[in-house]
Amino acid sequence: MVAIPAVLLRVDAELGYRWQAWFNDSFEYLQNTVHFKLDPTRASGYSIWLKILQPFHSYAVVTILQHLMGLAVAVMVYALARHRGARPWLATLAAVPVLYDGFEIQLEHLIMADIPLLFLLVLATTMVLWNPAGPSLRTCALAGLLLGLADCIRAIGLPLLAVFAVYMIIRRVSWRKVAAAIVVCLLPVVAYAGVFDLEHGQLAMSDATGVFLYSRVMTFADCPKMNVPVDELWLCTVVPSAQRPIAQAYIWTTPSPLDRYKPPQFAAAPNQLAENFAIRAIEAQPLDYAKAVADDTWRAFGWNRVVFPNAATYDEYLFNPHSLPIPSWDNDPSLGKYHSFAAAYIQGNPLTDVVAPFANVVRVYERHVYLPGTVYGLILLVGLGGLVLAWRRLGGEALLPWTISLALVVIPSATAEFDYRYVLPAVPFACLAAVMAFSPGTEGGRWLRRLAGRPHQDPRIPEPSGSAGSAGSAGSRSAGVSGVPSSASAPAVGSGDDQRDLATDGT
C-alpha cells in the first residue's frame, strides 16, 4: 500500500513530461548509441543499454524502465531489511526516500545512467547480504558480474568491487568466493577495455580519468610547489587559487589550459599528462587536496539545495514549466548536432512535451518533497553508531551498505567534482545500513532494548502474550507429547549474526 502513491507519482511524471527529461550528458550517450561507438569521455555501458532499447524508438520505454528500476530498488531495500530482522515499519521507512523523493523521481525520468547504476549496485548488495550464513560461490560470481556491468556504466564499479572484496574478507568468506567475484567482475570490464583499445588505441575504460582528476586539483594546484617538468608547465595557471572557478571549468570552458591542447583533451596523450600533473599536485599539496575533497563532499549534507555548480546545470535537475532546448553545441561536430541523433533515436521530435495539469503536480511536488542533505547525513551517523556498537565484528553486515553509501558521495568529489545526482543513489544504502545496524539480533538492536529496559528478544521468537490461555497453548506446542519444558526442548535460535559467530566455517 505504501508504494501505490509512489507509482502514481511516476505515472504523473510520465504523463506530464512526455516522455523524458534532458541533461547535457544525455546527448553524448545518444550520440554514442546512434553511431554505436565507445565514448572517450565516459564509460558507454548506458549507451549500449540504449542501443538494446533502440528498436522501440521510444524514450517512454527508457524512462518507464528506469522508473520501474527505482521502484525495484525500494522493494529490494524493504525485502532485505525484513529478511535480516527489521520490523515492518522500520523496513518501510528505509524504502520511503527512494519511493518519494521528488529529485529521485526526476532522476529516473532523465536519459541518464544513474538509475541503472543504482539498480545494479543494490541488486549486488542484496545478493551478497541475503543469506545470513554468507553468500554462495554462485552468488559471489553473480554479484561480481553486476559490479563489472556497473563499471561499464560509470567508472565506480571497480572501486566498489574493492569495497565488496574487503567486506567479504572481513566476514570470513572463503578466498575462492572472493576470487570468483573479482574474476567475474573483470570479465565485462576487460571486454569493454579491449573494444575501447580497438577504437581509441588505449586499453582503458575512457581517456578522461586524468582530465577529470586534473580539474579536481586545479582548484588549489600551486605549480611553484610541485616541481613541474617542462612538458607539463602548460597545464599551470597564474590565477590565484582564491579567484579560480569551479573544478569543471577546467574541463569544459575555453580559458582552461587543457583547451590549448590539439587534438582535443580527451585522448590518450593529454589525458596521461593531465593525470601526471594531478598526481604531482596531490603529492605536493595533500592537505589542500583533502580540504578540496572535504569541502565538496560537505555539499551533500546541506539542508537546502543551493545552486551548484551553475544555474544551467541546476535547472536540469528540476521539472521545469517549459521544455528545455536541446544544446546546439557538440563534442564531435563531424557526427552532427545533438538534435539530429536525439531525433534519430526515436525517429521523431525529441523535445519534451510538457503537459498540464500533470506537469504542474510533479513540478510542485519536487520543489517541496525531498530528503534534505542534512537528514541524509543524520542517517549516515545512525548507521555509523550501529557500526561502532558492532566493533567486535568490525561493523557486522551493515558495514557494506554504509561504506557503499559514503563511497558514492566521496569518490566523485575526490576524482572530479560534487554533483547532486551523485547523492541520490547513496541514500538507499545509508537507509539500509541504519536499519540493519539496529535490527533485533544485532548489537545495535540489543542496545536499543537495554535502553528501553527490555531484555533481548530474537525477532523470530514470538513475544509472550501474557494471557493464561496463550501461555498454555504456547506451552503445549513447545512441550509436545514428551512434556519437556520449552526452554529445554526448543533449539537455540539466534540471529544471522549470532549464528555466524558460532559457525566453524563462515563461508
Roles of regions detected by a PLM:
Residues 24, 62-71, 96-128, 137-138, ...:
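Multi-pass, polyprenyl lipid-linked donor-dependent membrane glycosyltransferases
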Residues 206-348:
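Membrane-proximal stem/loop segments at transmembrane-domain junctions that anchor or position
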Residues 1-21, 100, 185-195:
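Transmembrane signal-anchor helices characteristic of membrane glycosylation enzymes that use polyprenol
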Residues 160-186:
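Perimembrane helix-loop-helix junctions
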Residues 77-100, 115-119, 132, 137-140, ...:
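Transmembrane-helix signature of polytopic, membrane-embedded enzymes
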Residues 12-29, 37-60, 205-206:
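Extracytoplasmic catalytic/substrate-binding loops of multi-pass membrane glycan-assembly enzymes
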Residues 50-57, 62-76, 117-120, 372-383, ...:
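Transmembrane alpha-helices of multi-pass, membrane-embedded glycan-processing enzymes
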Residues 140-154, 165, 185-192:
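Membrane-interface alpha helices of multi-pass inner-membrane proteins
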